[in-house]
Amino acid sequence: MKIVVSGGGTGGHIYPALAFIHEVKKQHPNVDVLYIGTKKGLESTIVPRENIPFHAIDISGLKRSLSFENVKTIVRFIKSVRACKKLLKQYKPDVVLGTGGYVCGPVVYAAAKLGIPTIIHEQNSIPGLTNTFLSRYANKVAICFEETKQYFPQEKVVLTGNPRASEVVGKDGREARRSLGLDEKKKTVLIVGGSRGARPINEAFLQVLHEVEQKPYQCLYVTGDVHYDKVMKAVNDVGNPSNVIIRPFIHNMPEVLAGVDVIVARAGATTLAEITALGIPSILIPSPYVTNNHQEKNARALEKKGAAIVRLESELTGVRLLDDIDRILLNEQTLTNMKEAAFQLGIRDAAERLYRVMVEMIS
């Protein structure tokens, strides 16, 4: 079996693609995989580290306003489609999967025009430009939120969930807690702003850091590499509570997630897939700097089911954040209800579901 996978720009498109590849390799150890991305995207470093053959194409995204850059982008798209057709004819894949980001546009489009079975995977509740365009040509559209159905041709849609969810299931959080110096008997809240951190979340938590010492729970506070030095200077000025562990970055996040009771985070699709798979209640602060405000839409889907509290960045304060944490962690019934609501939303076999969609298409 040969498959081509394409998706990139951000981890939200790359990690679901990698989780899918891991599942296919588990089912078919001898599968041939080719990953197509860009030289500038994160995929150019992440994918080769996984020992997956990588091919880069020259393509950029469309601007949402009228721009001469868009003319150049369309020209590059046409050239990339030609290059992809040539590559696909040589490689002869059985199926092509696109997981979003502008790079998968010419790849999936070229495959569809060549009659190769194609799937696109949409992680967010509101689709991006690339997947909206590709849904006209792809054979199947895999989604993660029921609400997303309305944006795609109904006969093509299948609810699979985010394959990344499957990679956090079954992890043991005890070793991660021990290695971080966390008390195994205390409830734990993880505060994290994504791989680069989030300044507004850092600022809010620092406002109430001195009050956390009195709390019966503990905090694992992940600042993000770029904010760490500034945060530690502020912490040293007020004193670091004994029940707050501060780290710049967490490399073993699946294991860490398995050991926490509540998470304070952005509302990226991968994060939500992971925390619902594990049934972790959340306080979500959607990033306002994303296309279509999709993080707030993602977060509201969890809030609607009672799995999350949503705080917009504009209304976030330290006092409000600490009150929200207390509201969940200091009330056993609230904690239990939110855990159950989150767990019910989780799709733990997402990678296998997407794999089955692929198998049904090519068999």
From Swiss-Prot:
| Highest taxon of source | Bacteria
One GO-annotated biological process of the protein: peptidoglycan biosynthetic process
Pathway, according to UniProt? Cell wall biogenesis; peptidoglycan biosynthesis
Task: Give the UniProt subcellular location, in the record's own words.
Answer: Cell membrane
Output a single Gene Ontology CC term carried by this record. Answer: plasma membrane
Its Enzyme Commission number(s) read 2.4.1.227
Per the record, what are the reactions this protein catalyses? di-trans,octa-cis-undecaprenyl diphospho-N-acetyl-alpha-D-muramoyl-L-alanyl-D-glutamyl-meso-2,6-diaminopimeloyl-D-alanyl-D-alanine + UDP-N-acetyl-alpha-D-glucosamine = di-trans,octa-cis-undecaprenyl diphospho-[N-acetyl-alpha-D-glucosaminyl-(1->4)]-N-acetyl-alpha-D-muramoyl-L-alanyl-D-glutamyl-meso-2,6-diaminopimeloyl-D-alanyl-D-alanine + UDP + H(+)
Q: What SUPFAM superfamilies does the database record attribute to this sequence?
A: UDP-Glycosyltransferase/glycogen phosphorylase
What molecular functions are annotated in GO for this chain?
UDP-N-acetyl-D-glucosamine:N-acetylmuramoyl-L-alanyl-D-glutamyl-meso-2,6-diaminopimelyl-D-alanyl-D-alanine-diphosphoundecaprenol 4-beta-N-acetylglucosaminlytransferase activity; undecaprenyldiphospho-muramoylpentapeptide beta-N-acetylglucosaminyltransferase activity
- Per UniProt, where does UDP-N-acetyl-alpha-D-glucosamine bind? 10-12, 124, 195, 250, 295
Query: How is this protein situated with respect to the membrane?
Result: Peripheral membrane protein
List the InterPro entries hit by this protein, alphabetically: GlcNAc_MurG (IPR006009), Glyco_trans_28_C (IPR007235), GlycoTrans_28_N (IPR004276)
Protein keywords: Cell cycle, Cell division, Cell membrane, Cell shape, Cell wall biogenesis/degradation, Glycosyltransferase, Membrane, Peptidoglycan synthesis, Transferase
Chief subcellular site?
membrane
**General function of this protein:** Cell wall formation. Catalyzes the transfer of a GlcNAc subunit on undecaprenyl-pyrophosphoryl-MurNAc-pentapeptide (lipid intermediate I) to form undecaprenyl-pyrophosphoryl-MurNAc-(pentapeptide)GlcNAc (lipid intermediate II).
Matches recorded under NCBIfam families = murG (TIGR01133)
Q: Which HAMAP family does this entry report, sorted A to Z?
A: MurG
Family stated for the protein in its record: Belongs to the glycosyltransferase 28 family. MurG subfamily.
Q: What is this protein called?
A: UDP-N-acetylglucosamine--N-acetylmuramyl-(pentapeptide) pyrophosphoryl-undecaprenol N-acetylglucosamine transferase
Q: Which gene encodes it?
A: murG
